[in-house]
Amino acid sequence: MKEEKSEKESKVKKKISKIIGTITVACVLMMTAGCGIMGMGSKSWIEKQVSDIEKVYPTENPEDLFEKFPNGFRIEQMRLFEENGKSYSISLEMKGDKETRKIEGKVSRVRLESKPYKETVEKESKVEYIKDKGLVLAKSELTDELLPKNYFLFQKLKLNTNALKKLEVKDKSFSFETGKYNIKYLFINKEIDNYLELNKQKVSLDIIGRYTEKNKIYFHSVIIEKATELYFSEKVVEEKGK
């Protein structure tokens, strides 16, 4: 009986040892994988993700984007401002068509109301980028109201890894769920001053992108803010190939 009991105990101990061994290996694997994941979201990791922003910033001739993005691209801009105590946005949406090689879209001036939230398009026009002329409205009489500038910010603003590393970082974030990341810098820039009609004022420049392992495309938004007085965003997105 004692021998039988001892044999059973030995078998139980062996099973427990195997279970413990399996758990230990799993923990080691998880820790190893975790070390790789932990780098995601760090300042250096985010800076690496945004390093290809120099692919667009600057691009003096927007038509050159067709060479960089053969499947076409989208350009979006948004300005928020107040006028006579009312809130407005100027929204620009354009598409670089790979077939026609044209960059066309529309620009709208929209009245914004909060209670309840409501958007009212007050003025709108088709817009096209024409080389040597810049952004040209179909309704030229609305140019002053719909086009504060007749060119894109990315035509003038230079952003690259070396330049960004010299800037003060205000904030950064990364979402494991969505893959969305952003890094926010504080600085004064002549091209931004000229584009947004500022006077050597420090602004925050927020670069936003989305990380994915598959079907990687260029996707960056640049958001410029100054307290509550200024909000401007410009987004360039590469179209996916079929």
Predicted regions and their residues:
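Sec-dependent N-terminal signal peptides of Gram-positive bacterial secreted proteins and lipoproteins
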Residues: 2-4, 12-40
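N-terminal leader/targeting segments and the immediate start of mature chains
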Residues: 31-82
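Generic short beta-strand segments
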Residues: 76-81, 110, 184-192
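Extended lipid/amphipathic-ligand handling interfaces
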Residues: 90-98, 205-212
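An acidic-aromatic
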Residues: 93-148
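Flexible, processing/modification-adjacent segments and terminal tails
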Residues: 128-177
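Extended beta-strand-rich segments in extracellular/periplasmic secretory proteins, especially
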Residues: 159-211
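Acidic, serine/threonine-rich low-complexity disordered tracts
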Residues: 201-242
